[in-house]
Amino acid sequence: MKRITKFSLLLSLVLGLYFPTVFAQSNMTNEMFDLAKLKSGVKNKRISSTDPTGGNRDHLEPFKPGEKRIIADIKGTGVINHIWVTIAPPPPTLSRNDIIIRMYWDGNDYPSVESPIGPFFGQGWDERYNYASLPLSAGPENGTGLSCYFAMPFEKGARIEIENQSDRNIDAFYFYVDYLEMAKLPKDMGRFHAWYNHNLT
């Protein structure tokens, strides 16, 4: 019995020392670890609806029904890593299903992303609610602010377009588009694609 107890204690000590080391080594490629890495040739950039006068009108002027606006037209090479928007008026006064977001990569004339803005940010059924996931979130105050953290690489430019397909004005459209600017994309980088499929099931 004493031998079994001693062996169990020894095994516990070995495992206790071994697994944290293995976990730490395997965890050295996660995003929090990457924050400490020094990166050369990479710049953090942001395009936003900020008021250029320094005032508090940090939104685009009203969109008329049927109007399209380009909110980001980025030249060169990079990776979009964050998009945030909030829109007035909120649902149900203005349906997020009637506001379309399109994204174009590398000078293409066809969109790689085309979706109503609500479903793109994870808000279905023309509803608004708070939630959080790794790539998408909505909040506070019943999901008024919408965030996307998907990585969206591009080599020869990126363009993001918003279209108002509703029968009323978008009174205010606030946004950030954050991206990394670089001379060359890392190897094996694909392109982000998303489309909206509305089928009754």
Model-derived regions, located:
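A detector of low-complexity, intrinsically disordered, Ser/Thr/Gly/Pro/Ala-rich segments
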Residues: 2-3, 19, 27
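Bacterial N-terminal signal peptides that target proteins for export
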Residues: 1-9
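Bacterial N-terminal signal peptides
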Residues: 8-21
